[in-house]
Structures are given as C-alpha cells and as structure tokens.
C-alpha cells in the first residue's frame, strides 16, 4: 500500500514539474504578444495597445490609429 501511494505521489510531482516547464516556455514564447491588437483595431505607436506581430500602426486618420498588415516593405 505504501508503495502505491509513493508511486502516485512521485508521478504527481513529475507531472507538476513537466506542466510548470511547459507553461514557462509558453509564457516566454508569447510574452511580447500580451496586450496587442490585430488588424483594423485601434492602436497607438507611443503607448498601449500596440499591434501584434505582422501588423503596424498607421495614423492615416489621426487620432484614430489602426493596425494594418505588414507587407514587409
């Protein structure tokens, strides 16, 4: 009985460590994307909200700046 409980506790600890590592990697991957907005959403170059990757903030109709797709120019 002790062996079974020990194995269950050990597997729970291993699972918790694996989950913590996965979560940490995921947070690092998308850390820069938090608080960003997508296409045709209102943005600000100088403050938040800023555009997500692949978009840029254009203020053609100031003060309503919006995110547009970055064509790679």
Swiss-Prot record:
This is U3-agatoxin-Ao1j. InterPro entries: Beta/delta-agatoxin_fam. It is found in: Secreted. SUPFAM superfamilies: omega toxin-like. Residues 1-20 form the signal peptide. The presence of a 'disulfide through disulfide knot' structurally defines this protein as a knottin. The keyword Metal-binding does not apply. Expressed by the venom gland. The lineage of its organism: Eukaryota, Metazoa, Ecdysozoa, Arthropoda, Chelicerata. Belongs to the neurotoxin 07 (Beta/delta-agtx) family. 03 (aga-4) subfamily. Aga sub-subfamily. It comes from Agelena orientalis. Its main location: secreted. The keyword Secreted applies. Residues 21-34 form a propeptide. One of its GO terms (cellular component) is extracellular region. The modification Serine amide is found at residue 71.
